[in-house]
Amino acid sequence: MANFPASLLILNGKSADNQPLREAITLLRDEGIQIHVRVTWEKGDAQRYVDEARRLGVETVIAGGGDGTINEVSTALIQIRDGVAPALGLLPLGTANDFATSAGIPEALDKALKLAIAGNAMEIDMARVNDKTCFINMATGGFGTRITTETPEKLKAALGGVSYLIHGLMRMDTLTPDRCEIRGENFHWQGDTLVIGIGNGRQAGGGQQLCPTALVNDGLLQLRIFTGEELLPALFSTLTQSDDNPNIIDDASAWFDIHAPHEITFNLDGEPLSGQEFHIEVLPGALRCRLPPDCPLLR
């Protein structure tokens, strides 16, 4: 692998003391691969490190962390207007790793690193909300969003993605639907919803397949609505297929407009955004990402 160009790894500070990762990086460096490592401490660090990556002339910026870290790095990359932006590499180190998991990124650190450095760079889409905030994986709204934002950090650290499900079951007594109106290309729906998923990727909340047919290079976003009736069949798709469940509504569009009579919150790759009006649009081919050749998110 010594012939491959240099990379810069932007590592979430929570993973800075990961000894297996240190060993994997050392082994690659011993093979002649140049890997710069930078650790984030506060919001805005990812943007500064992407700027540094351009000055260093690296061809890949690797996001080492969970969906939030991937979001920060990818958002910084698509801001580059002059010249060719570095490709994005993925190193899943977070609690849920929903985007990396659905993309088929290896769990083994050494294999994930090699893919991030030497894999083929594919053009993929991103999405933007209200002309400002971006996401690479999914925007989720409703009860599911409240659960992911309220799940205690200690529970997430101990149990990983299943912690969201456990915390959700503990909060069933507080469950209330959100009323909203959603429009897209040739689509209009209005009613009460428990969960809204608008996906560039397929899963959120620690492995829940909210948008199971989403692709990252088709110029579309997939919508899934769980209406505010028959809670358990709607929330847990293991109990019924969506084709058999009238309380699950699917659509696909390059954009969606959402209006609510009261404030609702969307979770964008882990970052909450509250309001009553949301315009969500796809950004086709917004960045290049190193993905496995059999990546299920590619058409």
UniProtKB/Swiss-Prot annotation:
Protein role: Probably phosphorylates lipids; the in vivo substrate is unknown.
Gene symbol of the encoding locus: yegS
Family the UniProt entry places it in: Belongs to the diacylglycerol/lipid kinase family. YegS lipid kinase subfamily.
Organism encoding this protein: Salmonella gallinarum (strain 287/91 / NCTC 13346)
The DAGKc domain, residue ranges: 2-133
GO molecular function, one term: lipid kinase activity
Record keywords, A-Z: ATP-binding, Cytoplasm, Kinase, Lipid biosynthesis, Lipid metabolism, Magnesium, Metal-binding, Nucleotide-binding, Phospholipid biosynthesis, Phospholipid metabolism, Transferase
Gene Ontology biological-process entries: phospholipid biosynthetic process
Entry keyword annotation includes Transferase: yes
SMART domains, per the entry: DAGKc (SM00046)
Alphabetized InterPro entries for the sequence: ATP-NAD_kinase_N, Diacylglycerol/lipid_kinase, Diacylglycerol_kinase_cat_dom, Lip_kinase_YegS, Lipid_Phosphate_FormReg, NAD/diacylglycerol_kinase_sf, YegS/DAGK_C
Leader peptide range in chain numbering: none
Residues annotated as binding Mg(2+): L215, D218, L220
Location of this chain's protein in the cell: Cytoplasm
Binding site for ATP: T40, G66, D67, G68, T69, I70, N71, E72, T95
Native organism taxonomy: Bacteria, Pseudomonadati, Pseudomonadota, Gammaproteobacteria, Enterobacterales
Main localisation: cytoplasm
One annotated Gene Ontology cellular component of this protein: plasma membrane
Protein name per the record: Probable lipid kinase YegS
Cofactor note: Binds 1 Mg(2+) ion per subunit. Ca(2+) may be able to substitute.
Active site: residue positions: E271 (proton acceptor)
Obligatory cofactor(s): Mg(2+); Ca(2+)
NCBIfam families reported for this sequence: lip_kinase_YegS, PRK13054.1, YegS/Rv2252/BmrU family lipid kinase
Record-listed E.C. numbers: 2.7.1.-
